[in-house]
A protein has these predicted regions:
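Active-site beta-alpha loop architecture of Rossmann-like, nucleotide-cofactor-dependent enzymes
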Residues: 47, 63, 159
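S-adenosylmethionine
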Residues: 114-218
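Conserved beta-strand segments of alpha/beta enzyme cores
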Residues: 10-12, 39, 108, 133-135, ...
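Conserved SAM/SAH cofactor-binding pocket of Class I
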Residues: 60, 64-145
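Hydrophobic residues in well-ordered beta-strands that form the structural core
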Residues: 41-42, 111, 180
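A short, charged helix-loop
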Residues: 52-58
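N-terminal auxiliary segments of SAM/dcSAM-dependent transferases
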Residues: 1-48
Length: 218
């Protein structure tokens, strides 16, 4: 291209000082607090006296609490009784939701993600938060065959949720709870129809900047 007379390319360059990008990232990574009860922070943040203090090293994984969907799922978890509830965190990302579920008394807990980075990061974060009841798996909804849960948390996206909805319903115990997020307000009708047509009952929802987190019971 450089030798082709039909192309004219102008460019400039400059030297920049060597930068510690981890340090720069840390400067811009802020801890968050949800409903005055749950504090989510990175390892370099000071610990607080929050009722639930979660330490997350996100690396390449989704789930620091900053995104609207994670924030709303935390809200759902905070107002739900998880004591001795067998729980599934589907599409666990950093395992932040599984960690909070254990802090609220859930056990045992399965955390599943199809992404290898998320799988490894979830193991690290579970250990970092001294979790004893979380088992992390790399895979998809095919791992759910024969499983049964009292509570299922699935923060993924519209298409995957719709595709896997029957598996969620099949492994949800009677009177079990299904939390869904990862989609927009305009997706509520199709998500709700998929759930109710399979025997679930709508309970409530949170909305935040056009994102939604729904709660259903079986």
């Amino acid at each position: 291209i450089l030798d082709n007379p039909e192309f004219k390319i102008n460019y400039t360059f400059e030297e920049i000082e060597q930068v510690n990008w981890n340090e720069e990232w840390e400067k811009n990574f802020e801890a968050i607090e949800v409903d005055g009860k749950c504090h989510v922070r990175a390892p370099f943040h000071e610990k607080t006296n929050a009722e639930y203090d979660i330490v997350i090293e996100p690396k390449m994984s989704f789930g620091t609490g900053h995104h609207e969907t994670t924030h709303m799922m935390i809200q759902h978890i905070l107002e739900t009784d998880f004591s001795n509830k067998k729980t599934l965190d589907m599409g666990c990302g950093t395992a932040i939701l599984a960690i909070l579920a254990e802090m609220k008394g859930a056990q045992p807990i399965d955390a599943i993600d199809i992404d290898n980075w998320c799988y490894l990061n979830s193991i690290e974060n579970a250990e970092r938060n001294n979790c004893k009841h979380i088992s992390v798996y790399e895979g998809d909804a095919s791992l759910l065959v024969g499983k049964k849960y009292d509570i299922i948390i699935a923060n993924i996206n519209r298409n995957i949720l719709l595709n896997d909805m029957q598996q969620y319903v099949d492994c949800l115990n009677d009177n079990g709870i299904l939390f869904l997020s990862g989609f927009y307000t305009e997706d509520i009708p199709v998500i709700s129809e998929s759930c109710t047509s399979k025997g679930l009952t709508y309970v409530k929802q949170f909305e935040r900047n056009n994102w939604v987190a729904l709660k259903f019971v079986k």
